[in-house]
Amino acid sequence: MMNSFVVDNSVVMSWCFNDEANKYGDAVLGRLAESTAIVPPIWPLEVVNVLLVAERRNRLKQVDSVRFITLLSQLPIVVEHEGPERQMKDLLSLGRANNLSSYDAAYLDLAMRNDCPIATLDKKLIEAAENVDVTILKF
């Protein structure tokens, strides 16, 4: 995908919580004015899980979660869907080779297949991306 990048949930959720806001996350958000972010099918579930946990811990009110989901729906973030058979085989192999969770492997696999950079704050994912020659989105 031309002018696209993969964004992982560590970056996306930094947009939700004031105490997690950072310059990198803000720069990635700004980049969406001119680019499209792509995410794996697991991404919406990850977002919702973080919001539910935050609500239960009184970090967020329900209205804040709804507001954040509304914001995300207005951004050029595309969920890429793919058949599970290829995905399971490739993610298992990629996760093993790079000591990643299946979730992180899904983001890395997406960047590899689309030949695009990845935006992440996750140190293990950054290291794995560098190991397989995936560019880290930098500013």
Question: Where does each model-flagged region fall?
Answer:
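Phosphate- and divalent-cation-binding pockets in alpha/beta enzyme and binding domains
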Residues: 24, 46, 90, 127-128
